[in-house]
Amino acid sequence: VGRRDVLRDLVQTVARKKKSNCVLTGGSGVGKTAIAQGLAKLIVEGKVPDVIKNKTVWELDMTKLVAGTKYRGDFEERMKQLGEALQKQPDIILFIDEIHQIIGAGSTNQSMDAGNMLKPALASGKLKVIGATTDEEYRKVFEKETALARRFTKVSVDEPSVKDAKEVLKQT
């Protein structure tokens, strides 16, 4: 409800052959995660272009991925396992809430962070990602990592209007 334009932009971005990764930006609580869930619902209902009809949306919890990785190599091993799982199932769209956290995640002074580990798969198109972050974190963190940021299309998410908010409440 009230997010048709943003959902349309998201579907068009994910369905593209090049630069098909998307980062949803907006204030806290504006519904970025709900939009990713809306995409999953559209896919289940078959209301998307054929190129993404067979896709499944997975959510990656970066906090759980990093938790307990106290030794060098633990995080890299988890990322490697994630990459292998995603390669075995190519019809996955990965949703990463708070995507700015992948920059620096798991890195020590001589290891790669999650962002650098994802770049090759993003560049080749083997991995489709939808991220969500606040405008502030996008500017402060994500935008400064230009090699990663250029692989994403930014889609702004505004607060819903009062009318749309009331409609959402009526449907719940």
Task: Label the model's feature ranges.
Residues 1-172:
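AAA+ P-loop NTPase nucleotide-binding core of proteostasis motors
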